[in-house]
Structures are given as structure tokens and as C-alpha cells.
Amino acid sequence: MYKRQANGVIENGSKVGVSDALLAEAHFFRGMDYFLLVQTFGGVPLDLGAGELKFNISTSRTSVRNTVPEVYTKAVFPDLKTAVTELPDKPRVTGGVTKTVARLYLSKAYLTYGWWLENPNNIPTYPECNRTDPDGHDAAWYYQQAYDIATEAIDNPGPYGLMESFYQVNAGPYDRNKEILLYADHTQEDEYYNGGSLTYGSAVSYTHLTLP
């Protein structure tokens, strides 16, 4: 899900009867998208033309990059925390997002942001900004948050768990096994899940989108 579409679902979904669980999925994927972007490019725009995290329906060439701390504290953390609260324990569709998946992504986001604040390798950031947290927390605080939320996920795994052997993780008969946390399930037999479907598919069959 692209950020603009997620903005639209989050902003307008409740007006047309979209369930809290589906809204939580939109929050999860928007938070995940911003998390991937901030790791790759540094600070990225939160305002796509209609205001920060607002649904934009017109072309805009005036977006300005937010800082790395702003992306994390305004987008990544709030969206993933909403997902943790509102998502169900079991996936809505095969391979779909759950409370456990959101907890683990949030844990990784806390860990990554803590490392960014600490900056042990003296890596430059863009746009340039002070490596301080808007809420006044230090790297150690975020590392503790990462530990705490990961422990919650491990103690409450939901439908996930370890297979009996490493062989089973990769063997064909055990496809869609319980070690895979998040993936897009595409099959030729199902019109909705067939990646090559001209109606519903993307013409590309992505499978096993495992948690980074």
C-alpha cells in the first residue's frame, strides 16, 4: 500500500464503514513504508501537499523533507503503535499482518532509531539535524522499548512459531509455514491472490515477504 492511499484510508475510512482492523492495517503499512524510507533516504516528506500525513489528491512540487526524528516520532512510531493496539491476533487473510507482526516491526524501529541517535560510526544524516529526540529520550531508552515490545511479541506469538527443522522452513510441502510472519500469497487458482490476474493482480507474483 502506498502512503497516499494509506492516508486516504486512515482519513476517510471510518466515514464509509471501514472496520478498525482494516484501518489498523493501513496504519501498519504506512508506518512500515516510512520506516523503510527513513532507513534508505534519511528524512523524507510527511506532507505530500495537503498537510502532514493528510490525503492529497492534487499534484504537489513543494514537499519539504522532514528530519529523521520527525519521521520516526510523527509517523513510524504512532502508526505502528496504533497497529499493535487495533490489529487482531490472527491474520485477516493468508499471510496478513497481525498484532505480533506489528510488535516486531515496532521493536525493530525502536532499535534502529536508538542506533541513529547514538550514531556509533559517525555517519552523516540528511537533512542535517541534531541527533536529539523531540521527546527527550536517549538511545538507551529506545533500546529498552525495543526489548520490551519484542518480549511481548515473543511471549504472545499468536499463530507463529518455529518449525521442527531448518529443512521444513524451505521445503515445498511446508510452504506458508508458521515461521513466516508476513507475505503476499499468490496462487493461480484464486483470482484475488493471483499476482498475474489482470483484474486483481499486479502482474508480478511476490511471495514470502518475510519480516526484515
Name what the model sees in each region:
Residues T40, F55, W116:
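Flexible, glycine-rich phosphate/dinucleotide-binding loops
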Residues E52-T59, R131, D135:
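Aromatic- and acidic-residue-enriched carbohydrate-binding clefts of CAZyme catalytic domains
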Residues M1-Q5, T207-P212:
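Conserved small/polar residues in nucleotide/adenosyl-binding loops
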Residues K3-F41, T59-G96:
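Conserved, well-structured interaction surfaces
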Residues V44, L48, K81, G96-R103, ...:
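An aromatic- and glycine-enriched ligand-binding surface/loop that stacks and positions planar moieties
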